[in-house]
Design a protein with these regions (language model features):
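Metallocofactor- and cofactor-centric catalytic cores in central/energy metabolism, strongly enriched
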Residues: 2-3, 10-14, 23-26, 33-34, ...
Length: 179
């Protein structure tokens, strides 16, 4: 495993498009019968799936600084990608955020979670920031988060912290054999 240096760390990123517009697009792309059929087709046709994933990466990288984690948290973070946080924190800021909202690692940049708060508040989705996110499944890195979303691989990605009965699944729902 390559040890990240300051040059290779993720850098906080301010998205280019309004959160309100992104919530609208996300609503249009929610899982439905057609999207699931498209996802299944993309998974069966390797080259088409690779082209779709490359297009998704190009768009989301420019728009959000996307790191292609395969488990997109954008709808729960005001469309500010938590993977652009140098510490890749998915459930809120670290303790090093300065009073003016600067990132601890890159002080010349705004903390991605400050940006997420401002964007969620401006678009009326502040409650989304209280959703707890399960740890990222690194096996999905580089895969299409849209295909994963349409195929239901993101189910249980977020949980309401007030529901103490909610258990965040870390492992896939398929049974694992005992070691």
């Amino acid at each position: 495993m390559q040890v990240p240096t300051k040059a290779t760390w993720p850098r906080p990123y301010v998205p280019r498009l309004s959160a309100r517009l992104n919530y609208l697009v996300h609503h249009l792309l929610t899982p439905n019968r057609v999207n699931r059929m498209v996802a299944r087709w993309l998974e069966r046709h390797r080259r088409a799936g690779q082209a779709f994933t490359a297009a998704e990466k190009a768009v989301k990288e420019r728009a959000f600084g996307c790191r292609m984690c395969g488990q997109c948290a954008l709808p729960a973070t005001g469309y500010a990608c938590p993977q652009t946080c140098p510490k890749q924190l998915r459930n809120g800021p670290c303790g090093g955020v300065s009073p003016d909202g600067a990132c601890e690692v890159f002080p010349e940049m705004r903390c991605v979670w400050v940006v997420a708060y401002e964007r969620a508040e401006a678009s009326g989705h502040l409650d989304d920031l209280s959703l707890l996110q399960r740890p990222i499944d690194h096996r999905l890195a580089g895969s299409s988060s849209w295909v994963n979303y349409w195929q239901g691989r993101d189910e249980g990605l977020w949980a309401d912290p007030d529901d103490v009965r909610t258990r965040l699944p870390i492992w896939p729902t398929t049974t694992r054999s005992a070691a």
